[in-house]
Amino acid sequence: MKSKKNKSKKTSNALTISGIILLVLITVIYYLFFTGMSKNGEEKYIYIDNDDTADSVYYKIKPIATAHSAWALQQVGTILAYNENVRSGRYAIGNEGALQTLRNLRNGRQAPIHLTIRSVRTLDDIADDASKKMSFSKKDFMNAVINPDTCAKYGYTPETIMCMFIPNTYDFYWNTGIGEFLQKMKKESDKFWTPERKDKAEAAELTPEQVMTIASIIAEETNNKDEKPTIAGIYINRLKINMPLQSCPTVKFAMKRFDLKRLYTSMLSYDSPYNTYKYKGLPPGPIRNPNIEDIDAVLNYRHHKYIYMCAKADFSGTHDFAETYEEHSANSKRYDEELNKRGIK
């Protein structure tokens, strides 16, 4: 009887010890392979190039991961032959464990980049923004957008290609090539130009590129949202009667003098197809990348008889509008007098 009790006790102790060992083993495995890899729980990223190896990837991960998870990742990588499946891209090292992170790396499950296309003055500015976040260089971008054949592929010229970059935030993979990048921007541009927007452009007897060119001028003329449709109406009125647009921002763009606070008569004869004082019609393309608000202001322009505008002499950022040259001259005189009074040159 005593022997049976001792045997039962030994069995019970053995089971308890086995259970403890199993629990410890499970805890260790979970700790090594399933707890978040990043230090302090903060998600960080690694960038894997085409020439990276498994060892160089481990080296990149080590500074941003906990020591135990970096070790565990390397062990799993060895077992699953990660050295044969290294894929370039941008990957998150965050709350996922070593096992799932290794799966992401092997299968190319990248963390997307949120790239914001801003309303900026030049393609060079867009190239700066894009190349800071993407794997392609600024040179790659500029070589593409100034190439007539590349532009023609998407239905543009080097002067109008900016129209393809509608200001918004887009998701990309870091290692997206410049060709694929441009294809996506074209797709997003086509999506932006809905049948409703196209119909409005057609009703105004404008192409989408012409709409965006006018919108770019408006964006430089004012930040006042309420005035934008009125100013759009002025330029459309001028186009209809074949009157020069005479837009000061186009002269600044032509001269690449964006710092000018005042234009003088001598500047208005600057020879450039972008100078709308010297040449009738629209400039060859946008003078900046207009916001959606500016584009929609043109599509929903106000119908009126104004053909003149002048900044108000109170420097409120708004404008005086006029139907006749006499009215405009009076408005312009007040503004010039105030410029002189304030010593603005």
Where in this protein do the model-derived segments appear?
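Hydrophobic alpha-helical targeting segments used for export or membrane insertion
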Residues: 27-34, 210-213
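N-terminal Lys/Arg-rich, disordered targeting/topogenic segments
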Residues: 1-11
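Hydrophobic membrane-insertion alpha-helices, especially the h-region
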Residues: 17-30
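Bacterial extracytoplasmic/cell-wall-associated proteins, especially those involved in peptidoglycan
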Residues: 128, 134-139, 147-345
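Signal peptide-directed extracytoplasmic domains
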Residues: 35-192
